[in-house]
Amino acid sequence: MRLPQDIIIKPYITEKSNMEIGAGKYTFIVDVKSTKTEIKKAVEALFSVKVLQVNTMNFEGKVKRTGVHEGPRPAWKKAVVKIDTDPKPVEYLAKGGKTVTNNKKYKTSIEEFGVAQ
């Protein structure tokens, strides 16, 4: 099993990704072999947030030239993670018909991005 630090490589900061932070969407560069489930678990473990949705995109490496030599840049994967910005308590019925409320404390933003909601 891989560590969350091995799956999430770094945040992907662009003008578009900064605008999406207000909607609770954060963008990361992730390991090429990672799956959506692994990305979700890694973000929840690293940042203590509740992940609602993960969208991934694969990018092929471009061929670049240096003088007469040609070589490919490495392929990479981008993940857009939507977190729960308004966590609601979960109510369910326990044995005996009692209603139990589960108030898990999750963060509503990722402060490491430097943008507060």
Swiss-Prot record:
Pfam families: Ribosomal_L23 (PF00276). GO terms for biological process: translation. This is Large ribosomal subunit protein uL23. InterPro entries: Nucleotide-bd_a/b_plait_sf, Ribosomal_uL23-like, Ribosomal_uL23/eL15/eS24_sf. The lineage of its organism: Bacteria, Bacillati, Bacillota, Clostridia, Eubacteriales. Belongs to the universal ribosomal protein uL23 family. HAMAP family: Ribosomal_uL23_B. Part of the 50S ribosomal subunit. Contacts protein L29, and trigger factor when it is bound to the ribosome. It comes from Ruminiclostridium cellulolyticum (strain ATCC 35319 / DSM 5812 / JCM 6584 / H10) (Clostridium cellulolyticum). GO terms for cellular component: ribonucleoprotein complex; ribosome. One of the early assembly proteins it binds 23S rRNA. One of the proteins that surrounds the polypeptide exit tunnel on the outside of the ribosome. Forms the main docking site for trigger factor binding to the ribosome. Gene3D superfamilies: 3.30.70.330. It comes from the Bacteria. One of its GO terms (molecular function) is structural constituent of ribosome. NCBIfam families: PRK05738.2-4. The keyword Secreted does not apply. Keywords: Ribonucleoprotein, Ribosomal protein, RNA-binding, rRNA-binding.
